[in-house]
Amino acid sequence: MLSSLSPYMANPRNTLSQVLNFGLVLSSAFMVWKTLSVITNSTSPVVVVLSGSMEPAFQRGDLLFLWNRSPRVDVGEIVVYNVQGKDIPIVHRVMRVFPDVPTTGGKDVESVEASQKLLTKGDNNLSDDTELYAPGQEFLDRKTDLMGSVRGYVPAIGYVTIMLSEHPWLKSVLLGFMGLMVMLQRE
């Protein structure tokens, strides 16, 4: 077993360089993600459409770019939101905007900013999303539930992530292949 590692032990500088290059790639990707998060004011500035509920506007596997710096959302706008207690982003269209209702949360009503309340629906769905919301929730809160509004998309490119989540063995194969490429890379 140790004999297979001998080419890497013979030149530790080269091995260290490869490990550092791999770390640089990972940290650069993380920095780009965090920079996009700060610029767009969204915890997830890029999402993949996971279902066909927004067809024909967006197909399953489309990659969406979000923006969450607009103070208000309009009827007809396509938004991405998280349901309380679930971690799956949902992409749907705003069907109705309710009047702003200030929620005090134990503070003075005068010092509390009102948050927009929204009702959403998938273009390909028959009814609104109230069944998808958390139990007892009748609408979405703009500040707490929304991840952002869709500002752009790339068709079908996100299908890779769907394949990786539906077929876990593909993830192992891909990670193994990437690790092998890093180890066999010669500079």
From Swiss-Prot:
It is found in: Endoplasmic reticulum membrane. The active site is at S53 (charge relay system), H92 (charge relay system), D129 (charge relay system). It comes from the Eukaryota. It is a single-pass type II membrane protein. Disulfide bonds: none annotated. NCBIfam families: sigpep_I_arch. Component of the signal peptidase complex (SPC) composed of a catalytic subunit SEC11 and three accessory subunits SPC1, SPC2 and SPC3. The complex induces a local thinning of the ER membrane which is used to measure the length of the signal peptide (SP) h-region of protein substrates. This ensures the selectivity of the complex towards h-regions shorter than 18-20 amino acids. SPC associates with the translocon complex. Belongs to the peptidase S26B family. This is Signal peptidase complex catalytic subunit SEC11. The lineage of its organism: Eukaryota, Fungi, Dikarya, Ascomycota, Pezizomycotina.
